[in-house]
UniProtKB/Swiss-Prot annotation:
SUPFAM superfamilies: Helical scaffold and wing domains of SecA, P-loop containing nucleoside triphosphate hydrolases, Pre-protein crosslinking domain of SecA. It comes from Escherichia coli O6:K15:H31 (strain 536 / UPEC). Belongs to the SecA family. Residues 859-901 are annotated as: Disordered. May bind 1 zinc ion per subunit. Monomer and homodimer. Part of the essential Sec protein translocation apparatus which comprises SecA, SecYEG and auxiliary proteins SecDF-YajC and YidC. The gene is secA. It catalyses: ATP + H2O + cellular proteinSide 1 = ADP + phosphate + cellular proteinSide 2. NCBIfam families: PRK12904.1, secA. This is Protein translocase subunit SecA.
Length: 901
């Protein structure tokens, strides 16, 4: 009550922010007459003037009024478009490390030119981030004339571009590209073998378009660069034959062992669990197929990989549906983005799931991959010094933006009042009744010339509605992953009188739906149009535009509620742009996924009490409230998952930053000999300590073991036993110094043969290659640890704390292994001539190039551990202190490599 009263008196935080910014807008407006008087050359010269002022120490924020006034005036001259006051407000919000919520059609692309210009003045680069390549290219080309008029350079960063072109794009003042490409370039730069191979500059300012889609919807899916792992495609095929024999059971009853089902599905968490009966049948079938020996258990340690195959195959059959989660095109399984409905060419599910789906669909199974580098969008975008974003729907996720990214959300008012009518939801008992009602509504709307946009949540649903419309004889366009190339053209004409467009989720975001259709698209279709033709097209469009407005504007039909209210609002937001008329309505059924999983019992009870008949719809505040509560429940659960993922990924992120920082230092120096000398001392001290414990009696020394270790691991054939026989007075410390001196002497002799410069080059290459190899193995082990860490909860331990503790131990052990392997490799390498060192270096380069060609870029679902299979194959089991050391010395681990821990 008190908060409401205070808000009424002083205004909300949003109101206070806008009030403060409106004062600056008044200053910008007052500068307009002065700017209009400037010649083109004088206006262009302002950029150089601003840069000089910044160099002299002026603060960027002080330039806002004048810089924004310059951009507005330049836009009037170049585009004939003047920034509205609300766009100036949006520009200021974006400069203040905030999220600007601006409704569809309010000109977000033009708004972005203001903060992009201002922050580009620093010379550190601005990254404008879009959701797909088409929008990146379109926005860059559209805004290029404005920025170039003002003396700034513009770059486009697209997938598949050669490194020199990418480097040029990043060197530009303002770079346009997709979130995926920026992230992958960051990972690739941190796998480079020379500073010249890197393409990015320091990450300065990121301006993210459709920020909710990138920072929230895609936050759970890390970017992964992977290389090929061991081939196990045959096993996927063999296990796939077994799965159709299993029957789904709604609930597992392991105690009474009743029911015919073999597995249960938890749709909320998207997990599949074998029942007791299912486990027995699976084991019988595996024995029958000759995959497993009789009497063996599927859960025995020896069958851990087999269990992985069974789980992947079960998930592929029970949870993943063709034309919903993926499509099959040209003999390839292509993932469909659940948020946008677009296909994600080249991306693959992790943990063997993609191979299992390929086996299910009978297409060629591609090899599993091993993670080489990985980062989540949450952690990538937090690397920027300054981050801001814009979207039409951010307010519902304001808490998440604030708690995870430290970004406040500011709702920017519309230029004209919003008059769209959002009609109450209609709920039917069955999907068939719902679809029929949608068809009737479309018939009524199109009969009076009103355009209709139908939003569906999957390709399967869009094709179902399309088939029904075809049966009813209604002409329509389908916009889903299968018709990707025509996306922008179809969306542009969706406002044509009586046009019916079916869009999967929010395919086509970023392209405005103009009432009456797009006259620009009609002009673009003509070859060398005359002024008369253009005028006629414009006049025809005006007639159509007025007719659509009279019919009620664009009508939006939602065929289902999405898990998130924000996605529903995005669909509604396609109508009612810039004060246009419009309407929207959602049609639901008790068979919809959201209703079935989260709201079914309560709402079904209400509907029965209200005595519903077939074909009847319910329209009641109770039902709407129950649906909103179901959505809040899902949103809250998804937020918790993302927050938990971030807490776990932060552990890996600290390690990633340490490794990448060390790697970049290595790349930037030409001489690492001091580092090599320092770690050689550490390695030899630790190695000698394992056989000659400090301050110990001579009887405790293991001289034969030490000699063997030095010979095997460092190619040092030293007669230590002879030294001790000839010099009984040889002290432990003197012996250590002599061994180290001998190793340095042998190494220096190699250096004399090949030359100091060549040796420095080789040392650097060995350090980089060893670091990359161990980091790759560490990532696999971390994924494997993450997969099973939740089980620690059963031992009354906090899984997060256990994960932090164990991953730190693994990281420390990896750094020790790095030292040991670098010195071992450098000691063992045999070189006689400079040409041989050059040849070794050439081999290393060729191997790096081969791996680069085999790398796959994937944006993978983090619900499964990305490299569990690999870790099971390559991750070493934990060695007990009293176990024999894995190095083969024959000593106990605690007296050998255990001392390095």
């Amino acid at each position: 009550m008190l908060i409401k009263l205070l808000t009424k008196v002083f205004g909300s935080r949003n109101d206070r922010t806008l009030r403060r910014m409106r004062k600056v807008v008044n200053i910008i407006n007052a500068m307009e007459p002065e700017m209009e008087k400037l010649s083109d050359e004088e206006l262009k010269g302002k950029t150089a003037e601003f840069r000089v002022r910044l160099e002299k120490g002026e603060v960027l924020e002080n330039l806002i009024p004048e810089a924004f006034a310059v951009v507005r005036e330049a836009s009037k001259r170049v585009f004939g478009m003047r920034h509205f006051d609300v766009q100036l407000l949006g520009g200021m919000v974006l400069n203040e490390r905030c999220i600007a919520e601006m409704r569809t059609g309010e000109g977000k692309t033009l708004t972005a030119t203001l903060p992009a210009y201002l922050n580009a003045l620093t010379g550190k680069g601005v990254h404008v981030v879009t959701v797909n390549d088409y929008l990146a290219q379109r926005d860059a080309e559209n805004n290029r004339p404005l920025f170039e008029f003002l003396g700034l350079t513009v770059g486009i960063n697209l997938p598949g571009m050669p490194a020199p072109a990418k480097r040029e794009a990043y060197a530009a003042d303002i770079t346009y590209g997709t979130n995926n490409e920026y992230g992958f370039d960051y990972l690739r730069d941190n796998m480079a073998f020379s500073p010249e191979e890197r393409v990015q500059r320091k990450l300065h300012y990121a301006l993210v378009d459709e920020v909710d889609s990138i920072l929230i919807d895609e936050a759970r899916t890390p970017l992964i660069i992977s290389g090929p792992a061991e081939d196990s495609s045959e096993m996927y095929k063999r296990v796939n034959k077994i799965i159709p024999h299993l029957i789904r059971q709604e609930k597992e009853d392991s105690e009474t062992f009743q029911g015919e089902g073999h597995f249960s599905v938890d749709e909320k968490s998207r997990q599949v669990n074998l029942t007791e009966r299912g486990l027995v049948l699976i084991e019988e079938l595996l024995v029958k197929e000759g995959i497993m020996d009789e009497g063996e258990s599927l859960y025995s340690p020896a069958n851990i990989m087999l269990m992985h195959h069974v789980t992947a195959a079960l998930r592929a059959h029970a949870l993943f549906t063709r034309d919903v989660d993926y499509i099959v095109k040209d003999g390839e399984v292509i993932i469909v983005d659940e948020h946008t409905g677009r296909t994600m060419q080249g991306r693959r599910w992790s943990d063997g799931l993609h191979q299992a789906v390929e086996a299910k669909e009978g297409v060629q199974i591609q090899n599993e991959n091993q993670t080489l580098a990985s980062i989540t969008f949450q952690n990538y975008f937090r690397l920027y010094e300054k981050l801001a974003g814009m979207t039409g729907t951010a307010d519902t996720e304001a808490f998440e933006f604030s708690s995870i990214y430290k970004l406040d959300t500011v709702v920017v008012p519309t230029n004209r009042p919003m008059i769209r009518k959002d009609l109450p939801d209609l709920v039917y008992m069955t999907e068939a009744e719902k679809i029929q009602a949608i068809i009737e509504d479309i018939k009524e709307r199109t009969a009076k010339g009103q355009p209709v946009l139908v939003g569906t949540i999957s390709i399967e649903k869009s094709e179902l509605v399309s088939n029904e419309l075809t049966k009813a004889g209604i002409k329509h366009n389908v916009l889903n992953a299968k018709f990707h190339a025509n996306e922008a053209a179809i969306v542009a004409q969706a406002g044509y009188p009586a046009a019916v467009t079916i869009a999967t989720n929010m395919a086509g975001r970023g392209t405005d739906i103009v009432l009456g259709g797009s006259w620009q698209a009609e002009v673009a279709a003509l070859e060398n149009p005359t002024a008369e033709q253009i005028e006629k097209i414009k006049a025809d469009w005006q007639v159509r535009h007025d007719a659509v407005l009279a019919a009620g504007g664009l009508h939006i039909i939602g065929t289902e509620r999405h898990e998130s209210r924000r996605i529903d609002n995005q669909l509604r937001g396609r109508s009612g742009r810039q004060g246009d008329a419009g309407s929207s309505r959602f049609y639901l059924s008790m068979e919809d996924a959201l209703m079935r999983i989260f709201a079914s019992d309560r709402v079904s009870g209400m509907m029965r009490k209200l005595g519903m008949k077939p074909g009847e719809a319910i329209e009641h505040p109770w039902v709407t409230k129950a649906i909103a509560n179901a959505q809040r429940k899902v949103e809250s659960r998804n937020f918790d998952i993302r927050k938990q993922l971030l807490e776990y990924d932060d552990v890996a992120n600290d390690q990633r930053r340490a490794i990448y920082s060390q790697r970049n230092e290595l790349l930037d120096v030409s001489d690492v000999s001091e580092t090599i000398n320092s770690i050689r001392e550490d390695v030899f001290k630790a190695t000698i300590d394992a056989y000659i414990p400090p301050q110990s009696l001579e009887e405790m020394w293991d001289i034969p073991g030490l000699q063997e270790r030095l010979k095997n691991d460092f190619d040092l054939d030293l007669p230590i036993a002879e030294w001790l026989d000839k010099e009984p007075e040889l002290h432990e410390e003197t012996l250590r110094e002599r061994i180290l001196a001998q190793s340095i002497e042998v190494y220096q002799r190699k250096e004399e043969v090949v030359g100091a410069e060549m040796m420095r080059h080789f040392e650097k290459g060995v350090m980089l290659q060893t670091l990359d190899s161990l980091w790759k193995e560490h990532l696999a082990a971390m994924d494997y640890l993450r997969q099973g860490i939740h089980l620690r909860g059963y031992a009354q331990k906090d899984p997060k704390q256990e994960y932090k503790r164990e991953s730190f131990s693994m990281f420390a052990a990896m750094l020790e292994s790095l030292k040991y392997e670098v010195i071992s490799t450098l000691s063992k390498v045999q070189v006689r001539m400079p040409e041989e060192v050059e040849e070794l270096e050439q081999q290393r380069r060729m191997e790096a190039e081969r791996l680069a060609q085999m790398q796959q870029l994937s944006h993978q679902d983090d619900d499964s551990a990305a490299a569990a299979a690999l870790a099971a194959q390559t991750g070493e089991r934990k060695v007990g202190r009293n176990d024999p050391c894995p190095c083969g010395s024959g000593k106990k681990y605690k007296q050998c490599h255990g001392r390095l821990q």
